UniProtKB/Swiss-Prot annotation:
Tissues where this protein is expressed: Expressed in stamen. Present in roots and siliques, and, at low levels, in leaves and flowers. Expressed in stems, especially in fibers and, at lower levels, in xylems.
The entry's DNA-binding region: 28-51, 79-102
Result of knocking out the encoding gene: Secondary cell wall (SCW) defects including severe reduction in SCW thickening in both interfascicular fibers and xylary fibers of inflorescence stems. Hyperlignified SCW in interfascicular fibers and xylary fibers.
GO MF annotations in UniProt: DNA-binding transcription factor activity; transcription cis-regulatory region binding
Gene designation: MYB52
Ranges of residues in domain HTH myb-type: 1-55, 56-106
The protein's name in its UniProt record: Transcription factor MYB52
Amino acid sequence: MMCSRGHWRPAEDEKLRELVEQFGPHNWNAIAQKLSGRSGKSCRLRWFNQLDPRINRNPFTEEEEERLLASHRIHGNRWSVIARFFPGRTDNAVKNHWHVIMARRGRERSKLRPRGLGHDGTVAATGMIGNYKDCDKERRLATTTAINFPYQFSHINHFQVLKEFLTGKIGFRNSTTPIQEGAIDQTKRPMEFYNFLQVNTDSKIHELIDNSRKDEEEDVDQNNRIPNENCVPFFDFLSVGNSASQGLC
């Protein structure tokens, strides 16, 4: 017999109670024959979930909630098995109350979370911190040092350094090494740099050496003229000799 798919009416519930009292809560097919439009399965579920006088309709206690959570961790969503540990509770009752507990805990967690900082805000803040660290790391790599100086920065003769570089005494390195704090003693270990300007040493070396030699010759000539300029002229007032034209140095 086809069952009608609708809510149970109060008259049907009263008829079901009378039939269960007459036939007992076992022979559901015989009971369904007395209820037009209801199947044996529908009668059984209606009885055990709603009409059975043994059903415990009291609210779940804290002890029952703890037992329900522990049973669910063991048996999962097997509600009919879990209901056996709760006399007077139906499988629908334990299932519905488990969902009530989960919803309540979710509301409690949402209250503890700071306002305006949900999951997306946390991920965004973490991403910003990660990007800052990456940028800082790139900045440190970009500031790796430059030329192989065998002396301290405070005593650099820039012209002499450039001259030694062009004559081959100082060379460039194309590799970079991140700076480690406290690992480099600038007074003992040379520093490194990039050849950003890409100087053409073959075309400029002779010009610079020639200019250097010219500067050195001018310095020598200047030094030779200084003693003569500093000489004090001597006048022979007594006409002793031809010293009037000579200076006293």
